[in-house]
Amino acid sequence: MKKTLISAAVICAVCGSAYASDVTLYGVVDTGLGYTYSDDDVAGESADHEFAMVSGQSAGSRFGLKGTEDVAEGLKVGFVLENGFESDTGSLGTAGKIFDREAQLFIDTAYGKLSFGRVGLLHSDAGSFGMMGDLSAFGTGWADIIGNQNMVFAYKPARMDNTVTYVSPDFYGLKIHAQYSMGTSSAKTTTDRTQVENESSTNRYFALGASYKIEALELYGLVDYVNKASYSDLATDSLAHHGKDQYTVTLGGNYDFDVAKVYLAAQYFDNAAEVGGEADETGFDLAKNDKAYGDIEGYGIVASTAVPVCGGSVKFTAGYMHAESDKTNKKANRWTAGAGYQYPVSKRTNVYTGVGYVQDSVNNRDPYAVQVVAGLKHSF
């Protein structure tokens, strides 16, 4: 009888481990201080100064749940639910969305991983699938300016709803990445049009990329395309600003020399509605992290490095962008530079500080901005 009970217990234990489920609570709290000085180089206008407590300067503050279950041999099902919040105020990162950073269900097999839901785009450093974080020592940037690739690359949202993502198995260091977003659905308001998922009233996103990792070398390539909305039921919305469909080609990589890790990335963009930061209908005003508005063609280059120093990491970066807007009949050149230091005070906590500079040359103006930040980041 004892042998039978022992055998049954062993069988149950084996079955339990073979088809085990696992759920993890995790998060990041990043809070710091930031000072920004910006001068638009416009006669009669004063420069702007801003000093504030800021959340997520080196990494977005968040908490999340993730879990997996082995449902059969070679078949795993999992999920990620991640919320972004402002650690300085306690508010949601995105109004109306509790899991704004990620909400996905995935299937993982020997043939690759297939994901469904709201996730970070391949052309981002966000979530489970973003590729851009490996192209810079600063990821996709600290604060608004320091090391921010989006300051010299075409802008896209970091995340999109209703997205299907596929990542292939590892073939001797090579992986294929593919993604399609059906866009979003939203009701009509006095200022916004109706958007219907996977129809011409919403922007849709396609991307195909590859990554190759072998020893100290990592290489990345990505082509992505935005099928811009072309229909509106809002009388005041002509969709003129949407223009032609946007595409970008991004190449880059990094190499770890032990004494320093070096990064290089370049991007060509065409028909981009926005480059730099936030939308600005008047055209280029980029030093304040604004985007140009129109069908923009151009390119950007970013180089950076991370050097181990005194138990931490010293980071340097420099970037350049040239962009032309046929719609606004403007050309712009942009230069960026940044430096930072990150020091781990424990396994899960680090302190950081950094400084960044950006300057434009556009329409006989040379606007510029300087940013200085310092903060504390804790992961759990």
Predicted regions and their residues:
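Detector for outer-membrane/organellar transmembrane beta-barrel domains
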Residues: 207-338
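Repeated loop/turn-to-beta-strand initiation elements of outer-membrane beta-barrel proteins
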Residues: 75-77, 111-115, 173-176, 216-221, ...
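Outer-membrane beta-barrel "beta-signal"
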Residues: 368-380
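Transmembrane beta-barrel strands of outer-membrane/channel proteins
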Residues: 29-35, 81-83, 118, 178-182, ...
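Outer membrane beta-barrel
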Residues: 21-35, 50-185, 202, 211-218
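Gram-negative bacterial Sec-dependent N-terminal signal peptides
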Residues: 1-21
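Gram-negative outer-membrane beta-barrel proteins
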Residues: 33-41, 85-91, 122-124, 184-188, ...
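Outer-membrane beta-barrel architecture
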Residues: 9, 64-66, 104-108, 165-167, ...
